[in-house]
């Protein structure tokens, strides 16, 4: 019956929208590289020693605990406190375990063993009872206060030691990183208790799903504090994102705000981290061996030899993090590296005058210095590029200042080099170094190993090539191509007009090589100059390689840099690069960045259909099918223009002042614009997806009611349609009071769920009664509903009354179907707090704070009355016309204020439901 109310064109549209949504979801959940993280292993059995907390503290936080990680002999030795190492505190995230510390703890222990425990780290971990803090924000403040107490407890464990620490380093995974940042907002917290903060896959900008006001209030408090106190915050902070493999927390949310006064913060995607170069999912980021090795190396380089603790020098801390996480020159970190190096010893000096040079070193018996005079090359070329496949940490490239072909001392240019997976390379613009006379490449004596060194001089215009990307709406039907015929080692393709998050492309690189015996490796690198989100692809030539191009962070308005596609190639190969729009990945970006707003658009569509049903009941006396009204009423032009106009007017000072006087919250569209998340036509696209979801959810709820009614009839004897309509049955006040007491004493979401189940039961019972009645009547397909009404005037009065009741029951079921759709979304949005309450029931019987309690007090009696409401009882209501007018502005309000604040949706939904219930009395 539900499907019969939709024409074939609309049905085809809904199926097509499902297809588009499937493409977008597939790109988000499956359209990324395979997991290239190596598993980190424990070489000894891991042990978690529980740290005894003060009794008052343990009583105040019965669900929380503090542990010290250890293995083997280290664990045995440190069971007897106090400790002697450097304290690091690990904070797990949403549903995270304190045992997630074992990967980095084990690697740090092995590193300490390698240096005979000259320095070592003590890794502590907090047990938050695997709380779902990403879904329920009421415990975030409690976690923050507990961590503060843990820090003080940890520092007491080192009392009396010669090099006792005065602060701890913190590693926060997921929401644990946000809790760590929130420590600074506590009144009694001393900022110098934290010397370093590293967060992994932490959504710093905004919550992934703002399901209650406690989460958004917590974010507002933390971010506002960091912005307003940026000048005084001296905490070195590193945020590492997982990249596209992490579909739970998109990387754009992990980037710390770039503040003019707070320069001690870095944000990077794991695919851009040197010696890591892989994307991680939300869980593997804590055990990915490549990333944990990088983190541990950074920790050991941060140690101050004098204090045997992490350095207090902010500049050094930032330099270490930059060295390991942003740009690695393939050298061990040095705080003050020597710029001038001695080039002495018994070495051979070879003069090279050609512009392109390759040297294959194998079993070299003596050191060789190859010198390249720069004077003549400056006249012809603009840049010099050198690379080496020997990935040791020794200096390998220098420059002479004197004019001779040999120099006793040279400028060490190795610090300006950069490490890639298979090479280390250096690119210099010659005009930036006018005082240099010679370039010197050093080849050490090697035994049993082989490596290749290449150098070439080139003109910028020959290697920096502009490649405009294809238009967004080309849908992959057109492409742009560049053919690289020169035998260069390095190319820079400037991807013009590529800077928005809604853009997505596929680049295909075809390499064709001349006959070579050895395997040739090429590296393709997407470099984003406005954020550290580079990604690398290694390809063997000859080959055809397809690479995805999409962004985590949009290009800032005042940034004029261009995204680059860097190619580290072979001179024996020719390359052909083709770029075209990827429609499926564009849909993926829509889902990735705006999928969380979909519930708001679904509810907006249902409200519009609900309005149509109420108005048809007022104007014609009958309620039309939900699907029919959805098709008729759910139009984007009824909602979007109002939001666009309000956003436009907010640009004027007088309107903004009026807006603030009315105490209205900030428009969600303005928030999205500030986060550079506004797609062209994004609201229209989401509205259409919302219409599709509203249709299929309506179909599902209608089918579920029919199925449940069939089961009811199979289990219970048939029931009759009610002849006496009673809005308030004798048991209704008692049931309402009981549910309100449940809400007050336990959890508001539980009471809402029970009320919802009661409402569904009443609807199922009505459906079963109607089915029983229809089965007991003779079938006459020739008569329509109107003809039945007309003919019934000539029949027995009792039968006339029953037929009217049957028609009214059908109308009531249509209305109830829409109300169930609305209530279902309220229940779904309240479920996180219910799940949290059930998980912590052994510690707390009453959820406090409870985001659903105020809503439950209003919704429980409303649902109780609506469950006993029939359309015949409200047709003549004076309030019906007013009630039918409310859903339209509320549908606009849902989009304006609920797309980025999902917890506001129930507030917009219960208003028309409450008015609907009041129609029974007015």
UniProtKB/Swiss-Prot annotation:
The chain crosses the membrane at residues 12-32, 642-662, 669-689, 734-754, 818-838, 854-874, 894-914. Residues 775-799 are annotated as: Disordered. GO terms for molecular function: deacylase activity; hydrolase activity, acting on ester bonds; phosphatidylinositol deacylase activity. The active site is at residue 174. GO terms for biological process: anterior/posterior axis specification; attachment of GPI anchor to protein; embryonic pattern specification; forebrain regionalization; GPI anchor biosynthetic process; positive regulation of ER to Golgi vesicle-mediated transport; protein transport; sensory perception of sound. It is a multi-pass membrane protein. Residues 1-11, 663-668, 755-817, 875-893 are cytoplasmic. Residues 782-793 have a biased composition (Basic residues). Belongs to the GPI inositol-deacylase family. This is GPI inositol-deacylase. It comes from Homo sapiens (Human).
């Amino acid at each position: 019956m539900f499907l019969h109310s939709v024409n074939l064109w609309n049905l085809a549209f809904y199926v097509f929208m499902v297809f588009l949504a499937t493409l977008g979801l597939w790109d988000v959940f499956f359209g990324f590289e395979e997991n290239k993280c190596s598993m980190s292993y424990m070489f000894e059995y891991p042990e978690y020693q529980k740290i005894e907390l003060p009794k008052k503290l343990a009583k105040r936080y019965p669900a929380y605990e503090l542990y010290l990680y250890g293995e083997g002999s280290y664990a045995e030795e440190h069971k007897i406190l106090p400790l002697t190492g450097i304290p690091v505190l690990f904070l797990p995230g949403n549903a995270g375990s304190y045992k997630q510390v074992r990967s980095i703890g084990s690697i740090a222990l092995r590193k300490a063993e390698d240096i005979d425990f000259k320095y070592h780290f003590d890794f502590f971990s907090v047990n938050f009872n695997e709380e779902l803090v990403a879904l329920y924000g009421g415990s975030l403040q409690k976690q923050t206060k507990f961590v503060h107490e843990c820090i003080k407890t940890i520092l007491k464990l080192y009392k009396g030691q010669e090099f006792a620490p005065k602060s701890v380093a913190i590693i926060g995974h997921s929401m644990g990183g946000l809790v760590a940042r929130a420590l600074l907002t506590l009144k009694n917290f001393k900022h110098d208790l934290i010397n370093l903060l590293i967060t992994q896959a932490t959504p710093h900008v905004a919550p992934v799903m703002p399901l209650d006001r406690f989460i958004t209030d917590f974010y507002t408090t933390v971010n506002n504090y960091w912005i307003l106190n940026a000048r005084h915050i001296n905490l070195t902070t590193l945020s590492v994102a997982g990249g596209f493999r992490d579909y739970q927390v998109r990387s754009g949310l992990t980037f710390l705000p770039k503040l003019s006064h707070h320069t001690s913060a870095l944000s990077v995607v794991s695919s851009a981290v040197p010696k890591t170069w892989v994307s991680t999912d939300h869980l593997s980021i804590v055990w990915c061996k490549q990333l944990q090795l990088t983190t541990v190396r950074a920790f050991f380089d941060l140690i101050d030899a004098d204090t045997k603790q992490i350095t207090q020098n902010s500049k050094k801390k930032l330099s270490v993090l930059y060295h390991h996480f942003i740009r690695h020159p393939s050298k061990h970190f040095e705080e003050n590296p020597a710029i001038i190096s001695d080039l002495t010893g018994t070495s051979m000096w070879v003069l090279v005058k050609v512009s392109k040079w390759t040297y294959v070193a194998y079993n070299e018996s003596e050191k060789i210095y190859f010198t390249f005079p720069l004077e003549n090359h400056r006249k012809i070329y603009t840049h010099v590029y050198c690379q080496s496949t020997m990935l040791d940490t020794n200096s390998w490239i220098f420059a002479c200042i004197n004019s001779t072909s040999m120099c006793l001392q040279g400028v060490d240019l190795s610090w300006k080099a950069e490490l890639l997976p298979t090479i280390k390379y250096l690119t210099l613009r010659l005009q930036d170094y006018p005082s240099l006379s010679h370039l010197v490449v050093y080849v050490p004596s090697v035994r049993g190993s082989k490596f290749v060194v290449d150098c070439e001089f080139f003109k910028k215009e020959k290697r920096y090539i502009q490649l405009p990307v294809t238009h967004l709406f080309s849908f992959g039907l057109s492409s742009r191509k560049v053919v690289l015929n020169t035998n260069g080692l390095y190319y820079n393709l400037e991807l013009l007009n590529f800077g928005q998050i809604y853009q997505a492309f596929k680049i295909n690189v075809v390499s064709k090589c001349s006959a070579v015996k050895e395997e040739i490796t090429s590296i393709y690198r997407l470099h984003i100059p406005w954020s550290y989100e580079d990604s690398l692809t290694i390809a063997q030539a000859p080959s055809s390689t397809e690479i995805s191009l999409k962004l985590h962070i949009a290009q800032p308005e005042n940034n004029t840099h261009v995204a680059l596609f860097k190619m580290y190639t072979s001179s024996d190969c020719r390359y052909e690069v083709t770029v075209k729009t990827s429609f499926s990945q564009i849909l993926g970006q829509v889902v990735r960045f705006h999928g969380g707003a979909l519930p708001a658009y679904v509810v907006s569509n249902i409200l519009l259909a609900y309005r149509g049903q109420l108005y048809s009941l007022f104007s014609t006396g009958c309620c039309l099918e939900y699907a029919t009204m959805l098709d008729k009423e759910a139009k984007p032009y009824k909602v979007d223009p109002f939001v666009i106009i309000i956003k436009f007017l907010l640009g004027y000072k007088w309107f903004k002042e009026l807006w603030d006087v009315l105490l209205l919250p900030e428009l969600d569209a303005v928030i999205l614009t500030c986060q550079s998340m506004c797609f062209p036509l994004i609201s229209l696209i989401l509205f259409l997806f919302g219409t599709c979801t509203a249709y299929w959810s309506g179909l599902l709820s209608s089918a579920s009611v029919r199925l449940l009614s069939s089961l009811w009839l199979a289990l219970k004897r048939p029931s009759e349609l009610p002849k006496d309509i009673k809005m308030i049955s004798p048991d209704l006040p008692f049931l309402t009071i009981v549910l309100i007491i449940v809400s007050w004493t336990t959890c508001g979401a539980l009471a809402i769920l029970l009320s919802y189940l009661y409402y569904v039961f009443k609807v199922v019972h009505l459906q079963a009664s109607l089915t029983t009645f229809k089965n007991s009547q003779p079938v006459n397909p020739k008569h329509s509903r109107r003809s039945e009404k007309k003919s019934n005037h000539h029949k027995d009065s009792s039968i006339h009354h029953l037929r009217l009741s049957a028609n009214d029951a059908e109308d009531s079921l249509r209305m109830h179907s829409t109300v169930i759709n609305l209530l279902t979304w309220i229940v779904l949005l309240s479920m996180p707090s219910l799940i949290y309450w059930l998980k912590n029931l052994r510690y707390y019987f009453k959820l406090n704070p409870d985001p659903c309690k105020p809503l439950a007090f209003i919704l429980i009696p409303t649902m109780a009355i609506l469950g006993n409401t029939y359309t015949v009882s409200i047709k003549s209501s004076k309030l019906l016309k007013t009630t039918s007018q409310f859903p339209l502005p509320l549908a606009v309000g849902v989009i304006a204020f609920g797309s980025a604040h999902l917890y506001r949706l129930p507030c917009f939904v219960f208003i028309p439901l409450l008015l609907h219930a009041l129609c029974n009395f007015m």
